[in-house]
Amino acid sequence: MYGKMKEHLSRTLAEIREAGLYKEERLIESSQYASIQVAGKEVLNFCANNYLGLANDPRLIEASSKMMQERGFGMASVRFICGTQDIHKQLEAAISDYFKTEDTILYAACFDANGGVFEPLLTDEDAIISDALNHASIIDGVRLCKAKRYRYANADMADLERCLQEAQAQRFRIIVTDGVFSMDGNVAPLDKICDLAEKYDALVMVDESHSAGVVGETGHGVSELTGTYGRVDIYTGTLGKAFGGAMGGFTTGRKEIIDLLRQRSRPYLFSNSLAPCIIGASLEVFRILKESNELHDKLVENVNYFRDRMMAAGFDIKPTQSAICAVMLYDARLSQVFAARMQEEGIYVTGFYYPVVPKDQARIRVQISAAHTREQLDKCIAAFIKVGKDLNVLK
């Protein structure tokens, strides 16, 4: 039987390669930081989600090691059997405090949080109204649910209102959006979304994966930026980006929603609890962020410095209030060649092109970190200018 399937898989893989869409994994030979080792060469990393520079922070490493010594390596159980330690509840409380919500539930990843939120809450009597550029985990979570589906154009409030009007016959309606859209770096207009939700009696859910720790005056996310605390019903997010970059996800929001997810969310019920070492480091993250805004302030300074100088050099940069800077090249082949040339210059960035982004919207996505020094930013900018001139992107 596998002979036939092997032929089919081989053809499919060949088609992926021929289309230029085959994903190669480049091996990193060091810890994750602003500077990393790739193929025996030191390069500056500008494509990690390590927004606050905490992935290799000594304080997190110490807290993780200490917790593992005290509480063991793994839980070997799901939460509702014997996989809940007091530290799990402490982390859930810390996340609730950070987002100003009533309760929190932990998952192995935000993919699980988004995959496990809709089906327990909604039925075929209800409606999910989702932004067209939402993350794949939201899309997959919606597919697992029987609710009627609507999709509105990215951050388009007129189109969202159209969907809300069409969904008025449904029992419950929920608007779902990323806080920051990962390919463009644009921020959802959450205040306007909440206005429409209140007008048409809908719930609001925001995925804060790329915005928590980054967006807002102190980095507390899109609700802080837009003044919408208390108006959002559900937040999902990850511990794998700004909050240390390891693993773990969460859903935080209204108490009754979280209570029901504990009873019926399948990724929560049937996945092992987060390991104590992850919990220990994550508790340290929220302690650090409660104590000081220093890392967020440094990130904002770095983002503004990079954007201003790249735009002054003549690059087309998408507007953003996040740490994601999309350097627009528009041509798929050019984006691949540009990224390869940047690595030759000692800068690790990635080119994105169709189908990850729309046709003729190819770009280099640059992700800035609080860990980047001014010297490293200058080196990255200089490399962009050099390669840009060599490839006739800049005159």
Predicted segment positions?
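PLP-dependent enzyme catalytic core of the Aspartate aminotransferase-like
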Residues: 58, 62-66, 70, 93, ...
